[in-house]
């Protein structure tokens, strides 16, 4: 008996008890399972297509065609494209100086708006403020960003939104600052070819005080002649505040201000934005009443955009282009222009959370099962070999 007991004790010492959770084979198995679950979760993704995908594509295609016909119109006049400053050869980048150039301009911002996908971004913003078919919106434009003007108007066309536009013609560098091809000239070509549904209903000179201050007399006369050529009412008084008031009266003659579904400002026109708040603090994109009141300052002149927004009309502010496109993960001044329908603006790739949750449950359950099994075996081992340890 003593001999058998001794043999049994020797076998116990030679083969010590190891819980399953400490076995190398178990740990290797759990590691392999972890890697397998990770690979499945990582490689199983879903594509979330934007609900407004079709409208975005339509708007971008409209803008592509609109840019093409404007380029052809420009080329018919024997104009050469400056490839250095217009690398995508749109033919729609202005010059650094002209008689109707009002301010300095950011060339890269102008190039960014001459991407048809910018129209798709405008559609996204319009959807954010719940614009629908047959809604009427007020639009404030300048000649500084013809690409952004086109983007807004083609987005309106794609969504069947009614735009009521007032424009200031003066333009900053690289914008629609060619005396023989102003924004009104571009707008007319687009309207005649059915790329946009409406033209501007009135126009001003633009520039400082909205009256062309710092422009030469010849420059101001050229703008006024261009406005007269397009048979538009000229907004020109002796004060900025009166120019703003006249704009409000024109918009009110079409529809009561509170009945407009949105106010869209394109560019930095002083009549549009006024001087009643710090312009640099106004973020691009969707603007609500508090966004204006929080940055207000006393003594300034309230612009048209601010008056609309304070009347609880939703606003879209299309300026500070780099900050704006960062909201949509779009490239700044892209070369070449990206394809329509690609990028997170149209569809976003996401990890499949259901698959990830299932993998987590499988892995967590496996670890729990091994731990539970090990605990039971440890308890049995202690009862068999050291019964007093449980007391």
Question: What do the PLM-derived regions correspond to, one by one?
Answer:
Residues 25-42, 361-364:
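Hydrophobic membrane-insertion alpha-helices, especially the h-region
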Residues 117, 123-129, 133-182:
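Membrane-embedded segments
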Residues 158, 164, 171-173, 180-185, ...:
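Conserved mixed alpha/beta catalytic, RNA-binding, or beta-rich assembly cores of soluble enzyme
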Residues 180-259, 263:
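A substrate-binding/cap region within the structured catalytic cores of diverse enzymes
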Residues 58-117:
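N-terminal, Lys/Arg-enriched amphipathic/low-complexity engagement segments
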Residues 36-51, 368-376:
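Membrane-interface motif at the C-terminal end of an N-terminal transmembrane signal
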Residues 3-19, 386-391:
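N-terminal Lys/Arg-rich, disordered targeting/topogenic segments
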Residues 269-270, 276-391:
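C-terminal functional extensions of proteins
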